[in-house]
Amino acid sequence: MKTLLLTLVVVTIVCLDLGDGLICYVDSKTSRTCPPGENVCFTETWCDARCSLLGKRVDLGCAATCPTAKPGVDITCCSTDKCNPFPTQKHR
């Protein structure tokens, strides 16, 4: 009986460990499991010289902490699987 209980505890711990990786989008169609220690998905958008023609530039990915916003850069962060989809661009 003790062996069965110990086996169940070990299996539970192993199963919980395997499901820890956060899944974030890294481009408009691709997502990946973040490496250990990176528990935040981010979306970073900004305008460059081609913004009026092509829309805002977009970076997606995983991070350990939410990146610090810089002037002219919008950043959103979240911590659930696939919570950072590629933003829809407004056509001009």
UniProtKB/Swiss-Prot annotation:
Its main location: secreted. GO terms for molecular function: acetylcholine receptor inhibitor activity; ion channel regulator activity; toxin activity. GO terms for cellular component: extracellular region. Disulfide bonds join 24-41, 34-62, 47-51, 66-77, 78-83. Residues 1-21 form the signal peptide. It comes from Austrelaps superbus. Keywords: Acetylcholine receptor inhibiting toxin, Disulfide bond, Ion channel impairing toxin, Neurotoxin, Postsynaptic neurotoxin, Secreted, Signal, Toxin. This is Alpha-elapitoxin-As2a. Belongs to the three-finger toxin family. Long-chain subfamily. Type II alpha-neurotoxin sub-subfamily.
